[in-house]
Amino acid sequence: MLQPKRTKFRKVHKGRNRGLAAGTEVSFGTFGLKAVGRGRLTARQIEAARRAMTRAVKRQGKIWIRVFPDKPITEKPLEVRMGKGKGNVEYWVALIQPGKVLYEMDGVSEEIARNAFALAAAKLPIKTTFVTKTVM
């Protein structure tokens, strides 16, 4: 699973997920999976989508993951009263804004890429769309 090796602080405020995304262009591969909605992806969801894509392309081509879960999410244990401090870090998430390219792929045909991204999109909690690299 993806998570930072070390961080400046163990726990962070909840914060808000507003604004527009950076990394909106397909820059490494030829095809991409772009977020249409806003939300957050857990490290498990990112990995599940990656596995689905890798199996769909039968390990051909190359896949780039353009998101990284760098925000810790804390949870209190079951049946624990409120108060007594913030809970323990349970998992890591990446905050996603509309327009962010999540995955990229190269070395496969468009049909295979579309199929692989469709399988990956089924594993993700946000709406996505298929994009291709624009050459200028």
UniProtKB/Swiss-Prot annotation:
Disulfide bonds: none annotated. PROSITE patterns: RIBOSOMAL_L16_1 (PS00586), RIBOSOMAL_L16_2 (PS00701). One of its GO terms (biological process) is translation. The keyword Iron-sulfur does not apply. GO terms for cellular component: cytosolic large ribosomal subunit. Keywords: Ribonucleoprotein, Ribosomal protein, RNA-binding, rRNA-binding, tRNA-binding. One of its GO terms (molecular function) is rRNA binding. It holds the Pfam family Ribosomal_L16. Part of the 50S ribosomal subunit. Belongs to the universal ribosomal protein uL16 family. PANTHER family: 50S/60S RIBOSOMAL PROTEIN L16, LARGE RIBOSOMAL SUBUNIT PROTEIN UL16M. Binds 23S rRNA and is also seen to make contacts with the A and possibly P site tRNAs. This is Large ribosomal subunit protein uL16. It comes from Actinobacillus succinogenes (strain ATCC 55618 / DSM 22257 / CCUG 43843 / 130Z).
